[in-house]
């Protein structure tokens, strides 16, 4: 430790001994747990954010295409079952023609979904959603009519075998010939009743199959509507995501203050 002498106005004065310089450096470093949590948050944002990842958009497109093709197939099957129902006895279900118009709207909705997948856009999305809503409404009406035919419209099917009950022809025969003719007519009636019973079961199975197809169309319509709305929401939020990405890029280009510089404090004592 040195001591300096300073002369002021001819008077010698001793200066204070110089003190050593102390520099205190504090360095703050984030813990490994904090870095792990930040990495997990970045991974979650990468996986579940709908507007930033290409696989998510492609997956939605494949789902929409598959649902559209399924709607078309179910619509064609509904029209085919309508043709089968038109060959049966008269019922409200047959007279309404619900199998045809429900199938036609389902085909239109499926075609709209495929067009929307091939040419994405807001207008195509709105048209596809409207067609899907129309298909859902028509298929719900078809379900109501089909259930009503099972509950209340059973009379034509219960008495379908009455066509076999006819009066026996009057044939002037006697003895063995008359007995043989009567047995032949009875046998024909039994065969007719058996065939009519089979036909009644067949039309009941067709109605049950049509009801199952309608239920499947309800499920597919709801799924297609959900995928379409999610796609529309993703397209609406895409400009906001692009704006946020530009802001993040601009923020990265500017030089931010270093955390180590903020946390580092230097104390110089003279």
UniProtKB/Swiss-Prot annotation:
<keyword id="KW-1133">Transmembrane helix</keyword>
<dbReference type="InterPro" id="IPR009281">
    <property type="entry name" value="TMEM176A/TMEM176B"/>
</dbReference>
<keyword id="KW-0597">Phosphoprotein</keyword>
<comment type="function">
    <text>May play a role in the process of maturation of dendritic cells. Required for the development of cerebellar granule cells.</text>
</comment>
<feature type="modified residue" description="Phosphoserine">
    <location>
        <position position="258"/>
    </location>
</feature>
<feature type="transmembrane region" description="Helical">
    <location>
        <begin position="95"/>
        <end position="115"/>
    </location>
</feature>
<feature type="compositionally biased region" description="Polar residues">
    <location>
        <begin position="260"/>
        <end position="270"/>
    </location>
</feature>
<feature type="modified residue" description="Phosphoserine">
    <location>
        <position position="245"/>
    </location>
</feature>
<dbReference type="InterPro" id="IPR007237">
    <property type="entry name" value="CD20-like"/>
</dbReference>
<keyword id="KW-0472">Membrane</keyword>
<protein>
    <recommendedName>
        <fullName>Transmembrane protein 176B</fullName>
    </recommendedName>
</protein>
<feature type="modified residue" description="Phosphoserine">
    <location>
        <position position="254"/>
    </location>
</feature>
<feature type="transmembrane region" description="Helical">
    <location>
        <begin position="65"/>
        <end position="85"/>
    </location>
</feature>
<dbReference type="GO" id="GO:0031965">
    <property type="term" value="C:nuclear membrane"/>
</dbReference>
<feature type="region of interest" description="Disordered">
    <location>
        <begin position="237"/>
        <end position="270"/>
    </location>
</feature>
<feature type="modified residue" description="Phosphoserine">
    <location>
        <position position="236"/>
    </location>
</feature>
<comment type="similarity">
    <text>Belongs to the TMEM176 family.</text>
</comment>
<keyword id="KW-0539">Nucleus</keyword>
<dbReference type="GO" id="GO:2001199">
    <property type="term" value="P:negative regulation of dendritic cell differentiation"/>
</dbReference>
<feature type="transmembrane region" description="Helical">
    <location>
        <begin position="209"/>
        <end position="229"/>
    </location>
</feature>
<feature type="transmembrane region" description="Helical">
    <location>
        <begin position="127"/>
        <end position="147"/>
    </location>
</feature>
<keyword id="KW-0812">Transmembrane</keyword>
<dbReference type="Pfam" id="PF04103">
    <property type="entry name" value="CD20"/>
</dbReference>
<keyword id="KW-0221">Differentiation</keyword>
<dbReference type="GO" id="GO:0097028">
    <property type="term" value="P:dendritic cell differentiation"/>
</dbReference>
